[in-house]
């Protein structure tokens, strides 16, 4: 334990030793010594101030309002014994224990201390102090933030965050005490890892530009080719297909020009094929099995508009009946030799004469 060695000149803050982290601070704390070494007035009375917990020790800083010869009181963990948390029925909770004097600490012997937490927090402080003491004994101290004294006051350097987050601390300003003038080596300017951003976080690589505000202007390649005329992959619409109705875009790639096997509609869907002659008025197109009459036949007489079903066209060798003769009876042969022409009956006769045989 040391007396008057870890406080600022104005007694607003504790002077944290180099390499230690501030874990917790409690204000409105009373410190008293029920049992103190004889012959010393430093331990008399009750002192009011603030209590600081670091990685290796507990520091009490007396309030400026108290006219007390003890400005600060430091208790390292390895010199504290028999620490307990007391919870009286009437009064605030407090921590009680025994402290041994440190070499060159400003006093000798041992004393019993009592720390009363007027605004609460004794149990939390005692639990955190026990964890910090155990971690320090194992060589892995708790670290949250490191403090060092500079020309303008106390500065905070962020350290390893093992368990507890730092609280909002007040910065004390004033001239540093003797021995704490210049900042220690390693706690001045933050290390290179906390300075300027690394090279990978500098300017964006070549080819990356800032996006246009609101995407008003389309990027290259998305101009009229996409929203205007069809892209090069789409060919013109085949003949016979009009403009698509609104809402239909250009046809897909696979529906471009028709394949070679699908030509334009043949002429059989338009005008009649060349092999069909002109049919008389009032009659439709002849069935597909009827072909054009031979060369010797003219226009059928009146009343015979079309060739009856089932009949076939006569050969070219057969000739038309002589002039003046009527069309043959439906059951008679279509054409006879001229010498047998006289034997044909008239159309009004019901008798049929058979031709004479020629011997």
Curated annotation (Swiss-Prot):
A motif (PPxY motif 3) lies at residues 245-248. A motif (PPxY motif 6) lies at residues 287-290. Residues 16-87 form the GRAM domain. A motif (PPxY motif 5) lies at residues 273-276. One of its GO terms (biological process) is egg activation. GO terms for cellular component: perinuclear theca; sperm flagellum; sperm head. This is Postacrosomal sheath WW domain-binding protein. It comes from Mus musculus (Mouse).
